[in-house]
């Protein structure tokens, strides 16, 4: 599984950098122009983001910063490759239930299935009640 951030995780960015990696960074950070130029506004936003996720405010976008940004933008990313359905249990089901804003007991029962089907309907997906990659992504967008 990949996101827009995946190709750039080995790329270290700092003030003065330019290009597509900077645009991806800026879009992920939000609240700043997406112009592909790592200037003062991007630097300030990077430091603010780093501090908000308890990373040192280094002004440098390294692997740790890319990883945290990816999880901030795609909080369900760790589960995209998993399948959850009635009878499933565990951390992925807890994350699913929290994303659906229902009681998070870690057990995929009829209530979770109903909530999943509603999310699938809103996303114009087949209403199977089974959560695989497309449904994970759709639920994430609905968060």
Give the label of every model feature segment.
Residues 1-143:
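Cell-envelope/ECM-targeting effectors and their regulatory/trafficking segments
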């Amino acid at each position: 599984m990949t996101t827009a951030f995946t190709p750039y995780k080995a790329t270290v960015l700092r003030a003065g950098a330019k290009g597509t990696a900077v645009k991806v960074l800026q879009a992920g950070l939000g609240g700043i122009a997406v112009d592909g130029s790592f200037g003062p506004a991007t630097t300030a936003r990077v430091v603010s983001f780093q501090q908000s996720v308890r990373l040192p405010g280094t002004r440098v976008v390294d692997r740790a910063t890319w990883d945290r940004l990816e999880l901030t933008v795609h909080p369900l990313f760790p589960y995209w490759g998993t399948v959850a359905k009635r009878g499933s249990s565990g951390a992925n089901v807890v994350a699913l239930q929290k994303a659906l804003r229902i009681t998070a007991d870690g057990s995929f029962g009829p209530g979770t299935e109903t909530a999943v089907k509603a999310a699938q309907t809103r996303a114009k997906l087949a209403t199977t009640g089974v959560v695989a990659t497309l449904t994970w992504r759709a639920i994430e967008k609905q968060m």
